[in-house]
Amino acid sequence: DAKCRVGTLDTLAFYCNCRARLTGQGLFVTNFLNRHRGLAASLKRMDEAFDARACALPACESGNIIGLAATGAPVDIALDELKSGALRLKRDTGLNLLPMVARIARLQRGLSDRFAL
């Protein structure tokens, strides 16, 4: 709502229900609003629902935080491959996902040249 209260959309049951509706190789993406209180608890619930296969990207310019969670086989992709795909999308559609790729790279903190979930 206007006061960033998400109610039942931020419960363990909600995240478990989202997971149950994904395919065997599903990816769940959510947006945590910039005034979201209790972000750590929300991420913990999402991580629990997805068997410790969840993460949050560093905040974007608006302050919003994107949460990702996965089911099925591990997600493991080179950051260069993500960047190449983002460049193709920008060229072909105008959709600029390069800032998202940069946030994913920051999430790795230079420890790896791959994104794994």
Describe the role of every protein-language-model region:
Residues 1-9, 32-33:
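A short SAM/SAH-binding and catalytic strip from SAM-dependent methyltransferases
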